[in-house]
Swiss-Prot record:
One of its GO terms (biological process) is tRNA 5'-leader removal. InterPro entries: Ribosomal_Su5_D2-typ_SF, Ribsml_uS5_D2-typ_fold_subgr, RNase_P. It is an enzyme of class 3 (hydrolase). The keyword Transferase does not apply. Pfam families: Ribonuclease_P. Its EC number is 3.1.26.5. This is Ribonuclease P protein component. Gene3D superfamilies: 3.30.230.10. One of its GO terms (molecular function) is tRNA binding. Keywords: Endonuclease, Hydrolase, Nuclease, RNA-binding, tRNA processing. The gene is rnpA. RNaseP catalyzes the removal of the 5'-leader sequence from pre-tRNA to produce the mature 5'-terminus. It can also cleave other RNA substrates such as 4.5S RNA. The protein component plays an auxiliary but essential role in vivo by binding to the 5'-leader sequence and broadening the substrate specificity of the ribozyme. The keyword 4Fe-4S does not apply.
């Protein structure tokens, strides 16, 4: 299941803001870029609710897999984990998260991917 629209990041200005103003956390399989939210950037996208909410973008390069089916499967796995483990209580945190997967052969190892994702979520203090 996909992330709800109010949890997604979109737009090139948003990503430029994250790249310039973020703290980066590195793992073996992925990197996290966490930045304080800036709802003013999202006003151009005509979003009704641009409050300071936790928002996420998952970027998977073609270096990870040439097949879009596999990249989308990885994205869905991470989004499903987020939906089940980020409660509405944590949704008030005013942070934006960009997840970049590094290249590697972990398409078949879902547990390794989720373990690293969870470790980086704890490391970045987005969940407790």
């Amino acid at each position: 299941m996909a992330l709800p629209k109010d949890m997604r990041l979109k737009g090139h200005r948003t990503f430029n803001y994250i790249h310039k103003n973020s703290i980066t956390y590195h793992g073996k399989l992925m990197t996290f870029k966490v930045a304080r939210s800036n709802p003013g950037i999202l006003l151009t996208h005509k979003l009704k609710n641009t409050s300071n909410k936790f928002r996420v973008a998952i970027a998977i390069s073609k270096k990870v897999s040439k097949k879009a089916v596999e990249r989308n499967k990885l994205r869905r796995i991470l989004q499903e984990w987020l939906l089940t483990n980020i409660q509405k209580i944590n949704n008030h945190k005013p942070y934006w998260l960009l997840v970049n997967l590094k290249f590697g052969d972990f398409c078949n190892d879902k547990s390794k991917l989720l373990e690293e994702f969870q470790n980086l979520m704890f490391k970045s203090r987005l969940i407790k």
